[in-house]
Amino acid sequence: IDLKTEGIAALNTLVTRLKKYPRLTACKTLMITVSGNMPIPALWKNSPPFIHFDGRPGITYTPDQQKRIRLISASFLSFSKWNGTDKLTQRDREKLVAIIEAAHAINKPFRFWATPDFPESWTKLIELGVDIINTDDVVGLATFLKERK
């Protein structure tokens, strides 16, 4: 759930609404994950255990905070200006792989947001080792993934 407004107030509203659905909040196979304008990690302990968070690269988390992280994600544009069609430079490739591997080293899946959003870029993201592809073209990505099988 991508919080777009003030983090703590939005999260409190979300928690209040979700508590009306205990079958969802108690479901062990559903991970409710907050991203975007989140509270600082030191405040995560104030949220109920059914709320998980989107971690960020370069932040050192306590063991308790790490337990609340569902994935690590970052803006693609912070690491590369690749447009999805030109050749990805070796320097950019190394930066991208390093950030993905850092997430994997703490047993967390990784995603980039603000990526080029079409089949050629999805192919490259998979090759780089991302675990989750961020997209606004859900139908296109679903078709792409089905055709890859």
Task: Tell where the protein language model's regions lie, with residue ranges.
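Catalytic cores of phosphodiester-bond hydrolases, prominently lipid phosphodiesterases
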Residues: 1-149
